[in-house]
Amino acid sequence: MNVLLSPQPPVFPHHHENPRLSPQRSVSPLLGMSNRKRKADDDGDETMSPLSSPAISARPLVRPSKKVRSNELIGRPLPLPRLLETLDASQLRMVLERLCERHPDIGQEVVVGAPRPSVLSALDVLQDYHVKLKEAIPYGESSPEYTYYRVKEPLIALIDALSDFTPQYLPPMETQPTTSLQFLDGATKLIHDLPNWEPQAYRHHKESAYDDISRAWALVITEAGKRGGGLNLHTGGWDQTLSRHNEQSGGRLGTAMSAMASSVGWMGPGLSTQGNPSEQNSILNRLMSGSYGSPVRVGPW
């Protein structure tokens, strides 16, 4: 019986002990799967992120261009385009005139390249001179001497402008008689508005202006008469216009009136001011149609 009994008591494993070697903390299978799933999702997010995408990471980022500014802020002159923006018409004209005076070749290029002034633009400039003249006239009663010396400077400026603009609209520079006559009509109206002083010595500016404009009228009328035999002058009413100007000037446009009489005199003496209007229109219509002076048929043939 002693043989059957072991001298040492048997050792039974404790129910809390694991006979296999394992970590001290056991992990739940569900928790492990959750961790593995989160890690897989994290890996997928990293794969789909823009930073890990090879197509996007290889493309350089486009940034808006910025104006390069100097780090050093110092005073400097305006650029030419900005400077020109600050100049009005008078200042810009003065700068251009000085530049052309210093460099005549530039002035010639300006003369060739600039568009020809229209009649309206030229008369507008002359009207501005006339306004300055009227503004210089003193208010109230004053002596002729005082008035003359007050308006002398703007008066001479207007006369000089008339002398410069008038040749621009005379033949052969201007080939259209209507354009020339339109300018002369407006210029003559300005001369009518020049002041009249009692002393004859102060009237020489206006007298000289009338003489110059009368010769200009005569030149244009003579050239126009060569083309249409004076018919265009009469049909356009320029003979009537000149007659009114001559009356308003006190007969100072005699040279122009003589040229007009020579150009339209073949129509009959006093055709523009005398005679039956219906008869005159009949003659003009026959002239325009080419039937004036044609033989008249007599008899049945």
From Swiss-Prot:
GO biological process: nuclear protein quality control by the ubiquitin-proteasome system; proteasome localization; protein transport
Keyword set includes Cell membrane: no
Coiled coil location: none
Gene3D superfamilies: Tethering factor for nuclear proteasome Cut8/Sts1
Family: Belongs to the cut8/STS1 family.
Gene Ontology terms, MF aspect: proteasome binding
Pfam families: Cut8
Protein name: Tethering factor for nuclear proteasome STS1
PANTHER family, A to Z: FI02826P
UniProt-annotated stretches for the region Disordered: 1-56
Function: Involved in ubiquitin-mediated protein degradation. Regulatory factor in the ubiquitin/proteasome pathway that controls the turnover of proteasome substrates. Targets proteasomes to the nucleus and facilitates the degradation of nuclear proteins.
Keywords: Cytoplasm, Nucleus, Protein transport, Transport
Compartments, as annotated in UniProt: Cytoplasm; Nucleus
Subunit annotation: Binds the proteasome.
A cellular component term, taken from the record's GO annotations: nuclear membrane
Keyword Protein transport tagged: yes
Gene: STS1
